């Protein structure tokens, strides 16, 4: 759309009005040094083809003009030097570039049979995201990418992603969720209702208290994730929560002959199901 309505070239005109555009060697340059940056940058090549900086600049202007009050840009590490030019250009036109949050992601290495798959865009040898999703499924791909912070290199192990064992963090979490759901389903089959008046003081073992305390941290985890723009906080939290549940499950029966304790542990299990569902929903899984 920015090309069809010529907004990218209108952006050049706006920069010209600010004396931030000049021609050299047949190319159109952004006078970035006039805006306080270290080097001027080409916006339109001598061939007439725009560099990627120009549509990025026009796109941000368009977002500001449409009233967006916060923008989150996700760049690869190879664009580390590009985004300051984009922010500088829109700032020079009077837009508040502080409303743009830039996240720089490190690269991803795809591993198969323990070895990295060699990729080269020049040789058209690469794995697309679509191919990755076809190989292991969308939930696994999303979770593996979310697990790592933006500053951490990701080794995407295809064998691990397809492994149906506790070594696979997605399987580990899904297994906990399945166990919880099966307990709730079994209680329903036995006509045991969730009793909100259950005596929760009966939940006093270390594994139960650890699980309760961890669940209580969920709102803080969500807020911290929002504030830091680091969703790996949620995946780490959910993995730890699943770990606490597996420890609880290994030592305790939820449904037993002790009706009072059963009622209390069903409340605990139902609460855990809600937290797991909410966490997975936030992650889009």
Provide a role label for each language-model segment.
Residues 1-285:
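Non-catalytic interaction-recognition regions
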